[in-house]
Amino acid sequence: MAKRPGPPGSREMGLLTFRDIAIEFSLEEWQCLDCAQRNLYRDVMLENYRNLVSLGIAVSKPDLITCLEQNKESQNIKRNEMVAKHPVTRSHFTQDLQPEQGIKDSLQKVIPRTYGKCGHEKLQFKKCCKSVGEYEVHKGGYSEVNQCLSTTQNKIFQTHKYVKVFGKFSNSNRDKTRYTGNKHFKCNKYGKSFCMLSHLNQHQVIHTREKSYKCKECGKSFNCSSNHTTHKIIHTGEKPYRCEECGKAFSWSANLTRHKRTHTGEKPYTCEECGQAFRRSSALTNHKRIHTGERPYKCEECGKAFSVSSTLTDHKRIHTGEKPCRCEECGKAFSWSSNLTRHKRIHTREKPYACEECGQAFSLSSNLMRHRRIHTGEKPYTCEECGQDFRRSSALTIHKRIHTGERPYKCEECGKVFSLSSTLTDHKRIHTGERPYKCEECGKAFSLSSTLTDHKRIHTGERPYTCEECGKAFNCSSTLMQHKRIHTGEKPYKCEECEQAFKWHSSLAKHKIIHTGEKPYKCE
């Protein structure tokens, strides 16, 4: 292809194509990049292409740009797609395409390597994020650029990852460059330094609070186009990343990467304090707060602080009353997903927690934990008033009401108060007449489950309650309690009229008839 001469006094100018300023990664190199680095690559390549177009250079759209604009995952782009399959339309640098400052400013972003001054006086390639130090390039025409590249190859900087960059103005010259991590782009406000100009530009958006990328669906705005693109998946429901092991699909590649650790058992994040390992870095961050005691998430309503943001979110529902987790079977709603999970076991009758001692199974792990105390005899909850021990914290709470006299549960029908909610529930059946507990032997129904249990012993003949004094056995604990008063002489039931005392409540009821004159028994 012919070359067009430049301005008087200059040498012939090379041909600029998109391939000349493209960046190519091998598959191995690409896999070393994380999600943020891949997004940055996409943004830089799109910006480079737009810069060429904005300069008036007639460049046909390469396949790579088409893929990137369609948000195609870059690791799925074959290497032959990284460079246009067909040569892009070439263009000469003519006099009317060389506005001095425009070319300099644009190439500062487009050309990812540094040269001092090369060739024409008006075309100076400035330092950009891919360079370190000042590089002297031989003066002369663009035909000497290849020599310039060879001269500077030995000065190219070091890094952990290779990045292939196409030679400038030469499709045949490709050399590996390395990056030292030197940071030459500095934020004027806080002094933070960056190794890439695009990183500095993204950082400065934090100060301006500019959010130029807006979601058309929900109106949410973002600082970075990559964040905007990632957000869109929420609305589309797209899940392009599928696990080869179990087939589960994910919206983001990072989620798939984390999920795979479920199958591999990999836990790459280790706590330096205690050595505990985690699959996610966020889990390690949350765990570290156990050691530091940090609780950065505070409830604005009550001031309670939490170490994990999700715990604060769950806590807020106490104040709002929100119950977003609904059972599909019965429609019952819950504030927390864990409560819904436990509730579902009522419908499925699943009991995944089995006692190793006796084999009894439970739907809740907490129930199994309490059950184990039957075997161990552990009673970790002690009353500070009387020293009595209990297996359950709820039992201690109920017991304390004996000392305080608290009766927080009131019947709306008759105003009677109770210390237990279950006792109030049982009491309400007196007003409703409900008898939900039915004997399968004789069909007799009862309002209390305990009464049905006692009744069944009539059919079985079981008498599990034995008096330690005389050895007499009873089928009800209440009957044993009444019997013991024969030995103790206790008379807890006292008449308010004459103060006569009785061992049994039924005896007091009969005695009261003397004072009232009531004659309830009539001859038919």
Curated annotation (Swiss-Prot):
InterPro entries: KRAB (IPR001909), KRAB_dom_sf (IPR036051), Znf_C2H2-type (IPR050758), Znf_C2H2_sf (IPR036236), Znf_C2H2_type (IPR013087)
GO MF annotations, alphabetized: DNA-binding transcription factor activity, RNA polymerase II-specific; RNA polymerase II cis-regulatory region sequence-specific DNA binding; zinc ion binding
Gene Ontology biological process terms, A to Z: regulation of DNA-templated transcription
Any one annotated GO CC term: nucleus
Main localization, broad class: nucleus
Compartments (UniProt record): Nucleus
Annotated TM spans: none
Domain spans labelled KRAB: 16-87
Expressed in which tissues: Expressed primarily in testis and fetal tissues.
Record-linked SMART domains: KRAB (SM00349), ZnF_C2H2 (SM00355)
Keyword annotations from UniProtKB, A to Z: DNA-binding, Metal-binding, Nucleus, Repeat, Transcription, Transcription regulation, Zinc, Zinc-finger
Residue ranges covered by zinc fingers (C2H2-type): 185-212, 213-235, 241-263, 269-291, 297-319, 325-347, 353-375, 381-403, 409-431, 437-459, 465-487, 493-515
UniProt family annotation: Belongs to the krueppel C2H2-type zinc-finger protein family.
Function, in words: May be involved in transcriptional regulation.
PANTHER family associated with the record: RIKEN CDNA 6720489N17 GENE-RELATED, ZNF44 PROTEIN
Name of the protein: Zinc finger protein 479
